[in-house]
């Protein structure tokens, strides 16, 4: 009964939980984890999905060492399905070969009307020196990482297109950068050249993965809020 009550007090839904992983439906506006600018004490008080889950697992016991471990991240303004590990070993299991062990699809509303019904972007991405933005750079650039984004059109309107995106790699801001550089930034993505909107129109729709204990394929989904 206690765990049920605590789930209701969370600001998001727990989609699945066992002794190895915990899968949530993250709302837009919630940080995945703390920012580097905060000290340790402040980081523990910062409102993040990670801290909320730590509190949930500890059930109010201040001396408890139960915690979650990062496996991947969603940008603060991106909503949808994401997973945390319940041990360092499970975290390392996924992070050692994330792209092979998982599959992710997103839904995005992008500015303008895309004429093609489907396509793919491929480039090498690199963070700027301050880490704030990411951009495509020539192959062979130091610290650049290859990124591939496959997409298909779901619907079109007068001023925007809704696309389903299949990530073939998981780089920082990958979807946002690739669509911005194509001339169709994600609606609301002011950081990458879009007009201001009520939110960033990017949602992690599904996450599938091989379970770390038995290899069984598991898949979780979240309805798009737009």
Question: Which ranges hold each PLM region?
Answer:
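Pseudouridine synthases involved in rRNA/tRNA modification
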Residues: 1-21, 30-33, 145, 158, ...
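RNA pseudouridine synthases
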Residues: 1-133, 138-148, 156-157
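N-terminal hydrophobic or amphipathic segments with adjacent small-residue motifs
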Residues: 23, 74, 106, 134-138, ...
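A structural micro-motif recognizing beta-strand termini
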Residues: 111, 165-168
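Long C-terminal interaction/binding lobes of large macromolecular proteins
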Residues: 151
């Amino acid at each position: 009964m206690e765990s049920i009550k605590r789930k209701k007090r969370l600001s998001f839904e727990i989609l699945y939980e066992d002794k190895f992983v915990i899968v949530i439906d993250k709302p837009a506006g919630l940080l995945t984890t703390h920012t580097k600018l905060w000290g340790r004490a402040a980081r523990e008080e910062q409102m993040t999905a990670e801290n909320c889950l730590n509190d949930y697992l500890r059930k109010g016991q201040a001396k408890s060492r139960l915690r979650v471990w990062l496996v991947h991240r969603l940008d603060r303004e991106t909503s949808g399905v994401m997973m945390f590990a319940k041990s360092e070993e499970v975290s390392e299991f996924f992070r050692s070969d994330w792209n092979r062990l998982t599959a992710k699809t997103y839904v995005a509303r992008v500015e303008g009307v895309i004429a093609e019904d489907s396509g793919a972007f491929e480039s090498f991405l690199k963070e700027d020196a301050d880490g704030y933005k990411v951009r495509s750079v020539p192959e062979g650039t130091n610290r650049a990482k290859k990124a591939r984004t496959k997409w298909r059109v779901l619907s079109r309107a007068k001023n925007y297109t809704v696309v389903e995106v299949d990530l073939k790699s998981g780089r920082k801001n990958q979807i946002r950068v690739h669509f911005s550089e194509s001339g169709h930034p994600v609606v609301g993505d002011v950081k990458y050249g879009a007009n201001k909107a009520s939110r960033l129109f990017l949602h992690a729709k599904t996450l599938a993965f091989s379970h770390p204990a038995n290899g069984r394929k598991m898949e979780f989904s979240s309805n798009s809020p737009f």
